[in-house]
């Protein structure tokens, strides 16, 4: 492409401006498991629905997770229609069917498996990170009103399988080595069972990854205003580590395969402004979030574009960005 090159005219047609490039999924995602690793999120949500018992007894013993749907995981920029489903208002005697009215985002980390394991062969906690290829940013969209009606007794179904969005970049665990951090557990909490415990995990099991959510409404776009930040948190505040997720997932002999993906669960910090969902920021819809342009939100509206990003940064190490993950909500048909 040097000026005057004989091949310049031919090669110039191969160049595409970055703004015009369309990303594809970084791999074919196999099985998908979503965890629930933020104790701050679990406690905050629990207080809204079970004020006398916000954190269930198993939370501090087990890395809670459930199997999700990989077919609806899309790349950043994949807009989606507002989902429909059954909901039941608190005062209603019967459920009704229609578009979700309490659509929410969830700020998560996506974890990609590199090398799998054979069926019946658990992965030990000290070997767990050898099976992790890398990490991305993940938005696990949630239909809260559909979820509230359907989730008993087996957990979420239609409230989660309509759309999930990942960033186009997978940052390898090798690149993240300078940002590994100490993992601790409160002395008053139950200490991990032996298969979830190791000196290595205590020393460097966490990842220091800053996470941020921004919102761009249709009105903001019309006025050519930039998106507004909603919250910022950090993955190092997670109650369970990546290695513990892998070790727990396979301790019964479950086999993982290359391209499998874990979701970390919503990553909220200890402070209210570090909430990783609208459910928390709006106190389950009872306290509208005020935006700089005068708009308010309790949950997401049609035309809203949710943007998430993540980065690692500290003195003495190269800054690492995870790119953006964003998608716009289209009206239900």
Regions found by a protein language model. Give the residues of each.
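Active-site pocket scaffolds in enzymes
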Residues: 239-248, 257-258, 262-311, 316-325
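Interdomain boundary/hinge segments at the C-termini of tandem beta-sandwich modules
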Residues: 329-331
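Active-site microenvironments in enzyme catalytic cores
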Residues: 1-232, 239-243, 248
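Conserved phosphate/anionic-ligand binding catalytic regions in large, soluble enzymes, centered on
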Residues: 31-38, 255-265
